[in-house]
Amino acid sequence: MSGSLNSRWVVQVSLTIINIIGFLVFLRGFFPSKVVLPGFNSFQDSTKSPFSDQYGNPQFNKFILMVVDAMRSDFCFSDRSNFSFLHQLINQGRALPFTAFSNPPTVTLPRLKGITTGGTPNFLDAILNVADDQDDSQGLHNQDSWVHQFRHSNNKTINFFGDDTWLKLFQDQFTEFEGTNSFFVSDFTEVDNNVTRHLDDQLSSNKWDGLILHYLGLDHIGHKGGPESPYMKPKQIEMDKILQRLYTYVTKNDDTLIVLMGDHGMNEIGNHGGSSPGETSAALSFISPKFNHKGESPLPYNSDYSYHHKISQIDLVPTLAALLNFPIPKNSLGVIAKEILEIWPENQRIKILLENCAQIMNLYEAKYGPSGKVWSQWENLQAKQHPIADYYEFLQDIQSEMASSATNYGYKDIYAGALILVITALAVIVVFNRYFLTASNMNISSVMFYELFVVLYSLHFHGSSLIEEEHQIWYFFTTATLLFLAITFFDTFKSLQNFISFGVLFACIRFMRSWNNSGQKYSSQYNIAYYLSHSNPNLMWGLIILTYFVLTLCIYIQGSLVPTFAFSFGKRLPDVKDPGGLISFIVVFVATSVSFSFKLLQYYIDGNTIPKWLNRFLLWIIESHHIDLSSATLEDNELKFQLQSVSIQLSKFTTIILLLLVISRVIIGKIRKIRYGTITDITNIMTIYLIHQTRHENIPIFLALMFAKFALSKLIYRKTNRIDQYILTVTMTVLCLQNLTFFCMGNTNSLATVDLSNAYNGVKAYNVFLVGLLTFVSNFAGPIFWSLSGLQLLYEPSLLNFNGPATTDLLHYTGLKKSILLVKSLISLFFYTVSAVNLVGSCINLRFHLFIWTVFSPKLLFFGSWILFVNVLIDLILAVIVLLF
């Protein structure tokens, strides 16, 4: 390890920072702010509206928009739906039902922009969707929308209650309003009650012309328990009863239109953000006693979620404009719903469609100019009257063409960012090869294998299906890497112990591979996690208890926690009567017990049935906090709030006690000069917290991870005499296991699989930084586990074998600590820089690809999380902090 260590660190850290800067510059160009036409629209004929009747009156003077977040089409229209009053209205012809296609990304902010402006979403909005409450960068105050048009066309008032995203978008547009935060997903009840409590006052007054209600509870239930949650049925019934209240008001005020809709749907696990049929199929109904279009409801359930007529969700915008008589917003790509057109007399329908055509052609002209085949078609439509079907065909063709080409890339930033990434990658390749091929005493075959592995992996970014099914690639590369190391480094076939250890490692990997559905193309219930959570919760909780038990033993036996706190000196495992050893055991036992209690209570609050043999323990947890269950049910809101409060306390206590345990271990270890075991103790204590932040059905996978780590430590034990070879082997293996575990825990490269169910553990109110951190930990628990385990395998492999500290452990080479971490970081940096170049290159090459927003763009965001949070924050910064102690 030649050369100045400090100068090498400066070079490597600089390359890491430059790589991140290049990636961020590229993202700024790839996700630019959307360019829209300025100003606000007016009717083509300024003297008369084409939407008003012969007396100049609109079809409706007032409206009530009821948005139920994540209301998938089947929740309203299928035979599994609990919207019985809505079904009655459809059968009577008073409701016109639609399945509305929601353009990805299917998260609230871009969808609200789409359904108010009629424009296609900007993928950047998926990131801004989690922006802080004080961030007003998403606002639409300078962009045309039906909210602006309705309010200003006839000096009308709109009141709003619900998701505060509306207040960020439309500042100063609402006369009366109250916002509720959309990200506190643990709350199913109060978040909706805060909307409904305004209804009596609003429906008894005439102080509004428009009333917008945005309910979040159904979405929160989906995030916590999925579409099959036991809370889903009562929530649908609650929403149906609210609709009934609104319709009762409308029967007495028949100039008021009700619009019931979902902003997007949800997938089979209750999340959204991607492009699956469940996520993009939202319910939409126009409701009024004026309608007389009899339908049939409910319809048989179908897995495509296609019910009644299918339209694009942005078609709501011109449809509302026509019904409420105001100009269609300037940037709308929506098409007036054909079924709604029947409310006007036949001689007026073509005028209405021509208004829609003229508005959308203004957009077309601004982009392409007044020429070409499309322009000729438009002139032909204006010249003479055509069948209504011709106008709709023309509008839908233009909508499709304009929506697919709505992106305005910032090419200067794209190419600048790509150039920075290429230069950085070339520099890292030179540094990597210069060190491993010249300055290091390495087996060249291992270096060449790693470089080939990185290049082959990074090439997969050029295929959309390979990105969607990346878990298959990592299963292959992990298997191939271990087989290569079995021959070149592990000495697998030279002893029975090594052969058994290798077999255990492979068995654990195969076990992990079967744990969850991974990937985006194929979904199946034939996996371990689904079996445990749906068919055998008794076994699941037995495995959860076993996981906590094994981890508690590892903390107590594996590292040096006990000797650190022991009153007697010099013994690795002091006498059982030693007060210090007893205290350390009690603290660890309390931490794991409280964490387990939290997970059990969380499972119960989410509406799941607790195994009978755990009922007494659950009852003890609840009654110890002075809550009486004898006369209450989980549907009781007051009880639910009390249980939620207990859950928050348990989670906070777990976090605090684990943090104090780590701090005490480090400080007392420093005072007593106990050098060995610090990394192992921190890793094991942190693993409790990772389990604490993991979904219930995924907790037992940590048993497989711990056994895999133990087997791997057996294979590399006492092989540290070839230090560089050892570092490359451990880093390469950990890199494979990090990524494989990420996918095996149910994650994919889709925003729809981002798990929010543990993002609010111990959190009483929404805090963007705290929730963001918890979201990262809960979704990247597997990679974080292997990051910390990698340090164990590098510096303290003997402790992993329960053998006590050995002189061969690299921890004892204090002068090499920084050098070892430097080499490890160089190996990781080589992987991330080469991968970044290929990913960025594929996005540039395929920027007009059909799946650019549904596959490649989410991958960019996930890759950004890997390089910034996993590689830099965990693998580098956290590693430096751990090694300092």
Curated annotation (Swiss-Prot):
Where does the record say carbohydrate is attached?
82, 155, 194, 443, 516
Query: Which pathway features in its UniProt record?
Result: Glycolipid biosynthesis; glycosylphosphatidylinositol-anchor biosynthesis
> What's an example GO cellular component term for this entry?
endoplasmic reticulum membrane
Name by which UniProt lists this protein: GPI ethanolamine phosphate transferase 2
Biological process, per Gene Ontology: cellular response to starvation; filamentous growth; filamentous growth of a population of unicellular organisms in response to biotic stimulus; filamentous growth of a population of unicellular organisms in response to starvation; GPI anchor biosynthetic process; GPI anchor metabolic process
EC no.? 2.-.-.-
Q: Which Pfam families match?
A: Phosphodiest, PIGO_PIGG
Q: Which gene encodes it?
A: GPI7
Q: Where does this chain mainly localize? A: endoplasmic reticulum
Say what happens when this gene is deleted.
Cell-wall protein anchorage defects.
User: Which species is this record about?
Assistant: Candida albicans (strain SC5314 / ATCC MYA-2876)
Subcellular localization, as worded in the UniProt entry: Endoplasmic reticulum membrane
